[in-house]
Swiss-Prot record:
The keyword Signal applies. It comes from Neisseria meningitidis serogroup B (strain ATCC BAA-335 / MC58). NCBIfam families: OM_YaeT. This is Outer membrane protein assembly factor BamA. Part of the Bam complex. Part of the outer membrane protein assembly complex, which is involved in assembly and insertion of beta-barrel proteins into the outer membrane. The gene is bamA. It is found in: Cell outer membrane. Pfam families: Omp85 (PF01103), POTRA (PF07244). Its main location: membrane. It comes from the Bacteria. GO terms for biological process: Gram-negative-bacterium-type cell outer membrane assembly; protein insertion into membrane. Residues 23-90, 91-171, 174-262, 265-344, 347-421 form the POTRA domain.
């Protein structure tokens, strides 16, 4: 006797299959399969050959196979110890095409459809398509496309396949024509609208599209308005209602926002209650920056709560909770707060699992971690670990995820996921530097050699004025304590006569080798040492300024009108640096500072020294804008038998990295040579300061590659000497001084000071950093060489 169970009818009517006598399954057959393998079906079945079949298995089989999404219909039949499954497969998707989308990109729409299981080669389900189209329509409606029309078309193909074509007619966006506030007495509508990103129509809205309604932006705007009030003392401000009206053809919208301002409150007493365990309550109370009598600010409370949670987290209480109890006093217009702290369990890190480091060895990452295994969970150490791994430069993304350990409520595993970036390069590139022209370079480098963290580089470059070659190797962990050791071999030929710069009438040839060491002294500080042996050749030419000629005559030799210097220099370097920025790429907070000194040691043919100190500070003004303040000072001189700094080791100013708007290397003392050509030969002292407002390019898809800035620069290069047309040490009275006949000029900080202002663009291109700036000199003198537009393309070595 045979019993047929028709799945869809029974399940829709709520009828259970008829009771059968139990039997042992001897065979299972599947009919109706076209693409699905029988083995796949067997894997999903709740029974197998040899099992005892009873009257509950029919429904279970049907549910299991329907749940796969592979079938439109499933029937189960039994006869003589056999199971016969008859199925109707759903068609598979041959192609999925989208046309007409403008606001949303096709790739983004397809990715969204994939989340519903709608993709090429997947099984097609009409209900799923309807659900996905409805969700896509909601997305458009939320972006102000009220006339959106989405038409899906399903075309049946041979071999049980379908093509899906989705046609989108976005229609015109609804424009916001009016934004009105009701209930506001303290601040005007205009003032409140300035807090919002959505606007009424204006001159620039055709470009910014800020008058196109967007649900997400509107919700953010309401939060901004609330923040504005509550950060100015209005503790009990709230938005009562928002009313959005649309005209009949769905092209215009008006927004009415009803608010309750309430009274303006000042800070009262803020106290901490609860068990803070080993974290002293007095220590947490020091984090309470609110001052009684000052206007209440919600952002201040948010910052304080974050600091308290970080402090609790650094003691191992990763899941501490803080409940805030406000106690407003309507009579005194003050508000007290009680912060109830529930520390929860102290959490320990069981294991740290690292994934994504396909090339980089585990030890290279682990030696940067400050959060240890089997140690208390510490939020500050975890954040520092993330920063240190990011500063390696080997990874584009670093993320930590704490996963509770099953059965152990006080332990977590840390999953560290990394996204590796390319650290090796074979470069053949060309660039353009404004003052020296075409720069061609070739090099091979690897910053993460064989995944060990060591780096090696072989580089060469050629420009109109310079020929460079170098070979370097660095082991950042020469010792387990993080002492780095590096070696360098290099050669350089420099002839500025071939460039447009005013540093002319001499050339240098250098070859040397050195060893360097960097020692970490704290988490953020390093001390650097180095020794270099260098052979230097300097040649001056006929009619060179007397300053050059006198130096070569004193320390080198002359041949007619030309002169040359040859000799070995043994240089020692020492420096200290501190890096407390939050990013190696685009810092937004923190600072960099350093002191560096170089001395040509006794035994060198020339004996001189130089020292510099620099500082750069970053201050976040908002999520978008960062203020950068920087400065540098330097001094150089001779000692022993060398009474002055060699002219070819002078400081120079002007151009990118100094005072923009003035030609590179032209600031400081100047003289004429005997050809009557103006020469800049620099000074032994320098000072530069800069203020720069940094922000990403509006509308850029990747804010991490392009950055704009507005800047102001000031700087000076001087030597303290007095020059005139008869007795200048630089001209020897042979030609007229550039400052005018009979005039004298003392090279002081004030006299040589120049400043400028302008804008700049920095692009981290595949060829290297590209910099463009336009500056307007704010202090000009007749002898200055102005260059408002300056740029540097490609990389130089």
């Amino acid at each position: 006797m045979k019993l047929k169970q028709i799945a869809s009818a029974l399940m829709m009517l709520g009828i259970s299959p008829l009771a059968l006598a139990d039997f042992t399954i001897q065979d299972i057959r599947v009919e109706g399969l076209q693409r699905t393998e029988p083995s796949t079906v067997f894997n999903y079945l709740p029974v197998k050959v040899g099992d005892t079949y009873n009257d509950t298995h029919g429904s279970a089989i049907i549910k299991s196979l329907y749940a796969t999404g592979f079938f439109d219909d499933v029937r189960v039949e039994t006869a003589d110890g056999q199971l016969l499954l008859t199925v109707i497969e759903r068609p598979t998707i041959g192609s999925l095409n989208i046309t007409g989308a403008k606001m949303l990109q096709n790739d983004a729409i397809k990715k969204n459809l994939e989340s519903f299981g709608l993709a090429q080669s997947q099984y097609f389900n009409q209900a799923t398509l309807n659900q996905a189209v409805a969700g896509l329509k909601e997305e458009y409606l939320g972006r102000g496309k009220l006339n959106i029309q989405i038409t899906p078309k399903v075309t049946k193909l041979a071999r049980n396949r379908v093509d899906i074509d989705i046609t989108i007619d976005e229609g015109k966006s609804a424009k916001i024509t009016d934004i009105e506030f009701e209930g506001n007495q303290v601040y005007s509508d205009r003032k409140l609208m300035r807090q919002m990103s959505l606007t009424e129509g204006g001159i620039w809205t055709w470009l910014t599209r800020s008058n196109q309604f967007n649900e997400q932006k509107f919700a953010q705007d309401m939060e901004k308005v609330t923040d504005f009030y509550q950060n100015n003392g209005y503790f009990d401000f709230r938005i009562l209602d928002t009313d959005i009206q649309t005209n009949e053809d769905k092209t215009k919208q008006t927004i009415k926002i009803t608010v309750h301002e309430g009274g303006r409150f000042r800070w009262g007493k803020v106290s901490i209650e609860g068990d803070t365990n080993e974290v002293p309550k007095a220590e947490l109370e020091k984090l309470l920056t609110m001052k009684p009598g000052k206007w209440y600010e919600r952002q201040q409370m948010t910052a304080v709560l974050g600091e308290i949670q970080n402090r609790m987290g650094s003691a191992g209480y990763a899941y501490s909770e803080i409940s805030v109890q406000p106690l407003p006093n309507a009579e005194t217009k003050t508000v007290d707060f009680v912060l109830h702290i529930e520390p929860g369990r102290k959490i320990y890190v069981n294991e740290i699992h690292i994934t994504g480091n396909n090339k980089t060895r585990d030890e290279v990452v682990r030696r940067e971690l400050r959060q240890m295994e089997s140690a208390p969970y510490d939020t500050s150490k975890l954040q520092r670990s993330k920063e240190r791994v990011e500063l390696l430069g080997y990874f584009d993304n670093v993320q930590f995820d704490a996963v509770p350990l099953a059965g152990t409520p006080d332990k977590v595993d840390l999953n560290m996921s990394l996204t590796e970036r390319s650290t090796g390069s074979l470069d053949l590139s060309a660039g353009w530097v404004q003052d020296t022209g075409l720069v061609m370079s070739a090099g091979v480098s690897q910053d993460n050699l064989f995944g060990t963290g060591k780096s090696a580089a072989l580089r060469a470059s050629r420009s109109k004025t310079t020929l460079n070659g170098s070979l370097s190797f660095t082991d950042p962990y020469f010792t387990a304590d993080g002492v780095s050791l590096g070696y360098d071999v290099y050669g350089k030929a420099f002839d500025p006569r071939k460039a447009s710069t005013s540093i002319k009438q001499y050339k240098t040839t250098t070859a040397g080798a050195g060893i360097r060491m960097s020692v970490p002294v704290t988490e953020y500080d390093r001390v650097n040492f180095g020794l270099v042996a260098e052979h230097l050749t300097v040649n001056t030419y006929n009619k060179a300024p007397k300053h050059y000629a006198d130096f070569i005559k004193k320390y080198g030799k002359t041949d007619g009108t030309d002169g040359s210097f040859k000799g070995w220099l043994y240089k020692g370097t020492v420096g200290w640096g501190r890096n407390k920025t939050d990013s190696a790429l685009w810092p937004t907070r923190g600072y960099l500072t350093g002191v560096n000194a170089e001395i040509a040691l006794p035994g060198s043919k020339l004996q001189y020294y130089s020292a510099t100190h620099n500082q750069t500070w970053f201050f976040p003004l908002s999520k978008t804008f960062t203020l950068m303040l920087g400065g540098e000072v330097g001094i150089a001189g001779g000692y022993g038998r060398t009474k002055e700094i060699p002219f070819f080791e002078n400081f120079y100013g002007g151009g990118l990295g100094s005072v923009r708007g003035y030609e590179s290397g032209t600031l400081g003392p100047k003289v004429y040579d005997e050809y009557g050509e103006k020469i800049s030969y620099g000074g032994n002292k320098k000072a530069n300061v800069s203020a720069e407002l940094l922000f990403p390019m509006p509308g850029a898809k990747d804010a991490r590659t392009v950055r704009l800035s507005l800047f102001a620069d000031a700087g000076s290069v001087w030597d303290g000497k007095t020059y005139d047309d008869n007795s200048s040490s630089a001209t020897g009275g042979r030609v007229q001084n550039i400052y005018g006949a009979g005039n004298t000029h003392k090279s002081t900080f004030t006299n040589e000071l120049r400043y400028s202002a302008g804008g700049a663009v920095t692009w981290l291109s595949p060829l290297g950093p590209m910099k463009f700036s336009y500056a307007y000199p704010l202090k000009k003198k007749p002898e200055d060489e102005i260059q408002r537009f300056q740029f540097q393309l490609g990389t130089t070595f």
